[in-house]
């Protein structure tokens, strides 16, 4: 079809030029020919059932510039059906965030093990999703920064298992995880891949244990900050605590849920520095209160900035597969700023958040936008936070998103800068936030 159109266009140009027609008339006639051709091609495509999609853009900004579609006035998840993809079929079954915000320099046949609390117990078909790229910047970006390519590495063995009720219990029901029918997988830089499906039963109160052996350089990983039990072993028998562990970016289970909820943010969303294996951070408590009918996908990462989410569409696109998305950034944009830049101004952070919310609403998500929490900042940074928080409700209003006053819950009216429950809110703060969130938005998930 395209060759025929091209040949026709060339012939028209030759004929009209010979006859002395003006370029204006030639352009008008060509526009007519191309319009008819495109209409015909579209009709043929719809009849044969074939479709095509545009390649993913390198950033959210590029994606929005290339998009010709406009968002609805309000993304109502009860009315807007998400396209069926692997991400909507295999939904998150743990509140533990397993994205990439760090890199392991080099390892040889190291076995990593993680205990993952599940949102819904029972027997499910699982699929595991991976990206060999860093999602967000860690600290000043010396070791890991947004978009950094992972190195080549090899998976020699992977399993999931029933971890019992804790690390002291025997690990049982070890089930192999394969990749294209093979136990071994060679991974290229920036490669995204999935496992084959695997079925396993996790009884009430038990952990899902992920374990795999990898070798390679520059492997993207998660820094857990004592969130759950993560260990490594050089011989597969003696496991020792490790805080940097490569994991699937989504622990996906094929389960029937009424609603899907994702959260993208920093270490406060991830739950860092809360009590070990108690899962008292606010995201976990929201998931518990909403129940297993709501799949909760935690994409919070330590040190993450809003500017990271704008720069890395892969990270942001993961949460865009979910019905509702919590957006909770600000702290690290104020403290550290954009990777390789200086600390961001309130206006710059406002711009990043605007881009994120715009992107998600265009994808059909309900967005719940948090403001920046108190951090006991001194005058300069507190001034940025105050100015930013004054701007955030307007962003929510602009896109008919929901606004959540995160800051007010974690401070007092007399001392709004003071972090009452700590810079990383403790279990008590987690309860305060979860209670208020469910009271305000619970009806969305019924």
Residue spans for each PLM region:
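N-terminal secretory targeting modules
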Residues: 12-15, 20-22, 44-264, 269-270, ...
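Conserved, well-ordered alpha-helix/loop/beta-strand core segments that scaffold catalytic motifs
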Residues: 324-330, 357, 361, 369-371
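Conserved SGNH/GDSL esterase-like catalytic core that processes O-acyl groups on lipids
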Residues: 258-263, 268-354, 376-378, 386, ...
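Catalytic His-Asp segment of secreted/periplasmic serine-dependent ester chemistry enzymes
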Residues: 373-446
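Surface-exposed amphipathic alpha-helices with a cationic face
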Residues: 354-364, 393
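Sec-dependent N-terminal signal peptides of Gram-positive bacterial secreted proteins and lipoproteins
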Residues: 26-46
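A short helix->loop->beta-strand "cap" motif at the edges of active sites that frequently abuts
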Residues: 363-366, 401
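Positively charged n-region of N-terminal signal peptides that target proteins for export
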Residues: 3, 18-28
């Amino acid at each position: 079809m395209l060759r025929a159109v091209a040949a026709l266009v060339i012939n028209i140009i030759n004929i009209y030029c010979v006859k002395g027609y003006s370029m204006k008339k030639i352009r008008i006639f060509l526009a007519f020919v191309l319009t008819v051709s495109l209409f015909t091609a579209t009709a043929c495509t719809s009849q044969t059932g074939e479709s095509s999609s545009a390649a993913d853009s390198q950033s959210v900004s590029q994606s929005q510039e290339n998009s010709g579609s406009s968002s609805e006035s309000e993304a109502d998840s009860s009315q807007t059906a998400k396209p069926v993809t692997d991400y909507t079929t295999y939904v998150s079954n743990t509140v533990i965030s397993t994205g990439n915000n760090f890199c392991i320099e080099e390892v040889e046949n190291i076995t990593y093990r993680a205990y993952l609390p599940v949102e819904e117990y029972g027997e499910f078909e699982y699929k595991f999703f991976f990206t060999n790229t860093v999602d967000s910047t860690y600290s000043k970006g010396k070791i890991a920064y947004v978009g950094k390519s992972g190195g080549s590495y090899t998976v020699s063995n992977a399993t999931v298992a029933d971890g019992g009720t804790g690390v002291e219990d025997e690990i049982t029901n070890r089930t192999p995880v394969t990749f294209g029918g093979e136990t071994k997988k060679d991974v290229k830089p920036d490669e995204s891949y999935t496992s084959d499906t695997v079925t396993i039963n996790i009884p009430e109160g038990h952990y899902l244990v992920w374990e795999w052996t990898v070798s390679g350089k520059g492997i993207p990983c998660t820094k857990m900050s004592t969130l759950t039990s993560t260990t490594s072993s050089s011989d597969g028998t003696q496991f020792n605590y490790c805080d940097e562990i490569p994991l699937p970016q989504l622990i996906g289970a094929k389960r029937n849920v009424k609603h899907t909820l994702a959260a993208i943010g920093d270490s406060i969303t991830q739950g860092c520095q809360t009590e070990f294996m108690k899962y008292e951070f606010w995201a976990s408590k929201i998931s518990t209160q909403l129940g297993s009918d709501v799949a909760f996908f935690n994409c919070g990462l330590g040190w993450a900035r809003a500017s990271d989410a704008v720069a890395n569409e892969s990270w942001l696109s993961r949460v865009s597969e979910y019905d509702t998305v919590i957006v909770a950034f600000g702290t690290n944009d104020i403290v550290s700023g954009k990777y390789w830049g200086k600390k961001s101004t309130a206006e710059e952070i406002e711009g990043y958040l605007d881009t994120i919310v715009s992107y998600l609403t265009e994808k059909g998500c309900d967005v719940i936008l948090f403001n920046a929490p108190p951090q006991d900042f001194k005058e300069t940074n507190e001034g940025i936070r105050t100015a930013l928080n004054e701007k955030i409700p307007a962003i929510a209003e602009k896109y008919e998103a929901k606004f959540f006053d995160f800051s007010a819950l974690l401070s007092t009216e007399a001392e709004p800068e003071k972090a009452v429950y700590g810079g990383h809110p403790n279990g008590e703060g987690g309860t305060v936030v979860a209670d208020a969130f469910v009271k305000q938005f619970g009806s969305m998930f019924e």
